[in-house]
């Protein structure tokens, strides 16, 4: 089928339809070449018999198979004979050699042609073999580097007749054209290194002394070849790329250049930041487009609304004790984020907040499972667990060690918190069924667009005291290390020193993924799950008396929140803060997965707590309904499944190695966190910065291929634009560069508050009044031993004054009254106020910011 050529016009030239190889043109050219090759084979005539040494030619066009000749299949295997020295080189050295020999063209982060390790080494081996073979052709073969590039790109091995090596050195230099000078042509990659600052030795658009706006003056005269983007390519196309695409069609075109207007600089160069490419407004626009319900979210007074409104809840067996509550939590203030990403304030564990969290996290246990024989089925599930995951020989030969050393490490870790060997209790004398309870003050970021209709509920923690946990944690830590050493090779638990999400030699591309989302995981566990854990712990080598003892005080427990005055009984559900939480959740998830799916069909299986992820070459086959009918879990098979586990995406680089990338959506939300305490030397902010840098250490491994993978996975998981994920990576690169850039994201209004609270007025008169009614009205009464600052009036804007109160202990009502009166006399109460505006009065109390000032004692 013939495709008509587009008509020549400036519009077709600009939109890329004239002079640019479109997919249709490429297919047309390839079909014509195939037809010519087939015609050449049909018209083949055998040559007369002559001497082989004189007639055999190495021309690529003469090496065609005649009709009727035995055709041998060409092997595409990895050819390495003659290139053993390159097999010993590292990947970085091969990349340098690839750039030197093949000289690929760079378009942003994309190489053309792309790098392939096997093809590159095979090309080197074939080039060496061709150079050593006897030459019978009259044409000149290319030099070694150009020959490797020709083999890699599947082009001609010989120089063309017009541009042979001898002519390039002789004819061009001998030409005498007035006004022109000719030099030998050399292949360039098109890569321009970034400018380096001489002062701080950093990339100039990352250093503080770089003035990006000043460079705009040198770019006043521009053409469409400098800034115009051809469809199908990303980034700015330079002159070399444009000429290579348009070719000779640019010759008859007469372009008239006109000077562009002077760019308007909105921000003076001396006030500009380190870079103009990523700024705070761009990051906020990404948040607004990706999380539309988060941009206007402000929960500053949400908990106040909850505490002051009517409250109704339905709970069974709840005990409330409101006599010894902690009314206020000391807080020195927090840093205020510049970005509005939907992050909430810290939650205070009040009675209503704790009851709401218990209702969601601990109460209302679902009953979705069927009636089964618990003892028989739990043994069968444990047996399937060992068959699917455990290497029996390794389990038999491994030892149960490091218990005592783990105990000493735990004691050293919490030594600063006051834990010592003398404080360790006798566990037989302790009631281990009593657990302390608290809520997490930090709420997990919400990635769904529901913040406008739903208020996130904090998670709960059920835990023993450190003196009790210190005696169980070393045992389970040593048992978990033994469990990891006995796992099969394809099973990965990404925790500890011997395992992580970094998988060398495993590529996640072209694999089927299976991700199971288990909801209400902790409170859905019952007696069946407890029996499964008991059999598995005994099989791993845990002493049977300890296993039996541990399971007994998990059958029925009592939790109590001392701060909120709330307590309630619970049964078999998971204790979210004891020494066995992570280990137990991982065992339960693995046992459920092995019963619902055949683990032999997966190449890799990853488990971490209630998260699971499997990779297979074929679509996974199993029965996920058993998660609900047998294990009482609300399970959801994620469709479409992507390599995502532990809030991280798994990506593969060009060398077939897999590494983890934190979820960009959650990382952007963390940039607007409101939990960083205020400090004068920014020590807490710097700690968050170092944590941010550690989480984003993967940025140096992000090539264009990895960015494309992340964009695709991001779109599949969140149904949002993948281009936003690439923009987030640019923001992460800026804010991990140095601490000064990271400080742009937060500020503190503490100095601003000091300016507001400090006021000076020339006409300001205060009268002290000794009145019992006013003393009760302003709440100034306090006890003799109270060292706290005297509370201010109802205006809330005045500055409190320190008052020294006699510490002499007195008895009787008369002595206490005299001390209260003396304390009141030293307090300054601004009652009648005369201002320059002429307003005065004593009938009401007006805030100082409305009157014009405050007073200090």
UniProtKB/Swiss-Prot annotation:
UniProt keyword rRNA processing, yes or no: no
Pfam families attached to this UniProt entry: RdRP_2
Keyword annotations of the record: Nucleotide-binding, Nucleotidyltransferase, RNA-directed RNA polymerase, Transferase, Viral RNA replication
Skewed-composition ranges (Polar residues): 804-816, 824-840
Residue ranges of the region described as Disordered: 785-857
GO term, biological process aspect, one: positive stranded viral RNA replication
UniProt keyword annotation of Protease present: no
Top EC class for this record: transferase
Catalytic activity as recorded in UniProt: RNA(n) + a ribonucleoside 5'-triphosphate = RNA(n+1) + diphosphate
Quaternary structure and partners: Interacts with replication protein 1a.
Family: Belongs to the ssRNA positive-strand viruses RNA-directed RNA polymerase family.
Name used for this protein in its record: RNA-directed RNA polymerase 2a
Organism of derivation: Cucumber mosaic virus (strain Iizuka) (CMV)
Lineage of producing organism: Viruses, Riboviria, Orthornavirae, Kitrinoviricota, Alsuviricetes
